[in-house]
From Swiss-Prot:
Probable RNA-binding protein, which may be required during spermatogenesis. May act by binding to the 3'-UTR of mRNAs and regulating their translation. Its main location: cytoplasm. CDD domains: RRM_BOULE. This is Protein boule-like. It holds the Pfam family RRM_1. Residues 33-110 form the RRM domain. One of its GO terms (molecular function) is mRNA 3'-UTR binding.
């Protein structure tokens, strides 16, 4: 234990090397007439401590620091009437034993409110890694316990991140097929009968289109609040293919026109487009 001679004036002093972890603060202002006493047994009370130090001077006040539960932290402060009595105790600190236990005695120092900048303090200094009784790890640093939560693997959502309204509007999206058929209607004839035929349309002419209601597939689409839509997965549906037919008269090709709306779907409008058939008579 190394001790320094102290002057009565309350001037800042250099750090006092103390081996006990319950030692006095290392930086601050020395409090006159007061000493720090560490290594106190938890069974020792203030009256016992006063009686012991009264042998070396006139004791004014004795204070043992306790925790919130009232249990002694193992250190306290003794204030003497004069600085000379406190100085004498500091000089004889190595010789003082209480109940066969060596006391850790040093000057009483009041901590400075504005001390060393935080940037100059190493974060790892004074950090303790502990574990609770239930097995949760935490770090204790500067009087604050920091609990570490385990990492949770995030599961990506099955849909895009954009929000979808709680009551989506269903819009029917028609998917239809328009197969084209090229045909030539020919009839057998006997001698003496007329022969007639329907000419085959050329490649440049518009093909005949057949569209039946069974070929229309409706897929619901959800409309989001932000104006975007989330398309459902594409599903393939088997559709019936109409059989081509021929007529000897005038045929009309029907185109089914759709006017999709975000609210309702009107009935399909049938617009007939007459196509003329060219007749040829051979003798």
């Amino acid at each position: 234990m190394q001790t320094d001679s102290l002057s009565p004036s309350p001037n800042p002093v250099s750090p006092v090397p103390l081996n006990n972890p319950t030692s006095a603060p290392r930086y601050g202002t020395v409090i006159p007439n007061r000493i720090f006493v560490g290594g106190i047994d938890f069974k020792t009370n203030e009256s016992d401590l006063r009686k012991f130090f009264s042998q070396y001077g006139s004791v004014k006040e004795v204070k043992i620091v306790n925790d919130r539960a009232g249990v002694s932290k193992g250190y306290g402060f003794v204030t003497f009437e004069t600085q000379e009595d406190a100085q004498k105790i500091l000089q004889e600190a190595e010789k003082l034993n209480y109940k066969d236990k060596k006391l850790n005695i040093g000057p009483a120092i009041r901590k400075q409110q504005v001390g060393i900048p935080r940037s100059s303090i190493m974060p790892a200094a004074g950090t303790m890694y502990l574990t609770t009784s239930t097995g949760y790890p935490y770090t204790y640093h500067n009087g604050v316990a920091y609990f570490h939560t385990p990492e949770v693997t995030s599961v990506p959502p099955p849909w895009p991140s954009r929000s979808v309204c709680s009551s989506p509007v269903m819009v029917a999206q028609p998917i239809y097929q328009q197969p084209a058929y090229h045909y030539q209607a020919t009839t057998q004839y006997l001698p003496g009968q007329w022969q007639w035929s329907v000419p085959q349309p050329s490649a440049s002419s518009a093909p005949f289109l057949y569209l039946q209601p069974s070929e229309v597939i409706y897929q619901p689409v959800e409309i989001a609040q932000d104006g975007g839509c989330v398309p459902p997965p594409l599903s393939l549906m088997e559709t019936s293919v109409p059989e081509p037919y021929s007529d000897h008269g005038v045929q009309a090709t029907y185109h089914q026109v759709y006017a999709p709306s975000a609210i309702t779907m009107p009935a399909p409008v049938m617009q007939p487009e007459p196509i003329k058939t060219v007749w040829s008579i051979h003798y």
